[in-house]
C-alpha cells in the first residue's frame, strides 16, 4: 500500500521576498529555525525526498504555504501564483511519482484565477487548487 500525504507545503525563494517576507526578515535576524523552515519549504529535491523516504512517504500532494497569494494586490497575486506554480510544476515534472500539485490562484482576480487553474490542471496535471479562507482581510463568507 502506498502512503500519500495531502496538502504538504512548499514555497519558492521568491515567495519569501513577497507575502512571506516576514519569515525571511526573521531568519536574517535570528537564523535558526526560521532559516531551516525556509530551506525545507523551498527544497523540492533530494533533501525532501530523503525525508519522505525516511518517513515511509511515497508521494506528497503539495500546495503553497501560508499566507498564500490572497493577501497581495491582484496584479501581484497573479504574478506570484504563476511563479510559485511554475516552481511546483518543475518539481512535479522531475519527480512525477513522488509529487503532485495543488495550484495557488489569485482569488482577487477571478478571471485570471480560472485561467491559472485551467492551465495547471489541464496542461500540467495538477490535481486541483487550494483557496485560503480570506482575501486581503475579507473572509469568503463575509457579506458583500
Annotate each predicted stretch with a short phrase:
Residues 1-144:
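Helix-coil boundary/capping segments in enzymes
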Amino acid at each position: 500500500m502506498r502512503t500519500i500525504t495531502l496538502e504538504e507545503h512548499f514555497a519558492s525563494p521568491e515567495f519569501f521576498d513577497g507575502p512571506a517576507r516576514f519569515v525571511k526578515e526573521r531568519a536574517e535576524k535570528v537564523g535558526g529555525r526560521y532559516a531551516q523552515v525556509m530551506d525545507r519549504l523551498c527544497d523540492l529535491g533530494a533533501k525532501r525526498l530523503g525525508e519522505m523516504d525516511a518517513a515511509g512517504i511515497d508521494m506528497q500532494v503539495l500546495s503553497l504555504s501560508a499566507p498564500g497569494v490572497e493577501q497581495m494586490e491582484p496584479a501581484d497575486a497573479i504574478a506570484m501564483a504563476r511563479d510559485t506554480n511554475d516552481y511546483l510544476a518543475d518539481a512535479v515534472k522531475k519527480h512525477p511519482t513522488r509529487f503532485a500539485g495543488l495550484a495557488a490562484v489569485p482569488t482577487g482576480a477571478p478571471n485570471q484565477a480560472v485561467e491559472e487553474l485551467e492551465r495547471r490542471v489541464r496542461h500540467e496535471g495538477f490535481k486541483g487548487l487550494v483557496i485560503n479562507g480570506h482575501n486581503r482581510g475579507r473572509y469568503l463568507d463575509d457579506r458583500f
